[in-house]
Amino acid sequence: VKKINFLLSELFQYAHSEGDIAKNPMRNVKMPKKTLFKPEREIIALESEEVRALEQVAVMKRKNGLPLITHANLIVFLVHTGLRCGELQALKWSDIDFCSKTVTVNKNLSMVCDRDRNGERKNHKKAKIKGTKTTSGNRIVPLNTKAIAALKNLHTIYRKKGICSPNVVASLNGNMLSNDQLQRVLHRVLKYAEISKPFTLHQLRHTFATQTLNAGVPITVVSKWLGHANVSVTYNTYIHVLESVETTAVTLLEAI
């Protein structure tokens, strides 16, 4: 719109300077204000029965009694908290309060360019834990019964396998799992749950938001749990869910 406005203004200004027109009609044209609404994009989320299937896979065991998928409980934890992948990777066991049933989110793992002694960028990136990008990213998220169970199950598995790490996300040697490794865990869980839809870790966050909104949790509360900068971000992202909730509400109104 800005480009078209500029080109037309220049065109009419030239015509005015040449005497072809009395005045530039674009002179008093004002640009429209930016709208808060973004073009609607498709949000993929798991259905309730698919979430139940993930939970069942997380507790599956091999014949030797060990879990079928070591880190499957991380997937269950994500779908019940809505944390970003980087926030999960930066999470310490000390961030979990089992008494108050909350998790404190104040860190984020991101991939940054590594540099040599001269300050030049190297071809590879390294993982670095930083504070959350925004103030709203620092938050306390409540843990439901299933999120608590997933963490306790994971801690038990770590103990049985001799994994000793302050990190909630840890490999067999105690190192942090990468995004790709977590994505592979998700793919394995989806396979055993017989869910064929293409799915990413971030869509577990969408699933959490969708299910909480459908359950009737106020959007302001959901926005706070997700760590969004403001409630309009939540509204614009999940407007389709809110429209569905409104439709259900209208149906209930008819029953009064």
Regions found by a protein language model. Give the residues of each.
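A short, basic/aromatic helix-end/turn motif that makes direct DNA contacts
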Residues: 90-96, 223-229, 239
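Non-catalytic DNA-binding core/recognition domains of DNA-processing enzymes
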Residues: 1-14, 29, 143
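C-terminal flanking helix
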Residues: 9-12, 16, 242, 246
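Short, basic (Lys/Arg/His-rich) helix/loop patches that form interaction surfaces
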Residues: 56-68, 81, 141, 156-167, ...
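Catalytic-site neighborhood detector that most strongly recognizes the C-terminal catalytic loop/helix
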Residues: 109, 226-251
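Basic, Lys/Arg- and aromatic-enriched nucleic-acid-binding interface segment
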Residues: 2, 17, 21-23, 27-91, ...
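Conserved tyrosine-mediated DNA breakage-rejoining catalytic core shared by Y-recombinases
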Residues: 28-31, 50, 91-156
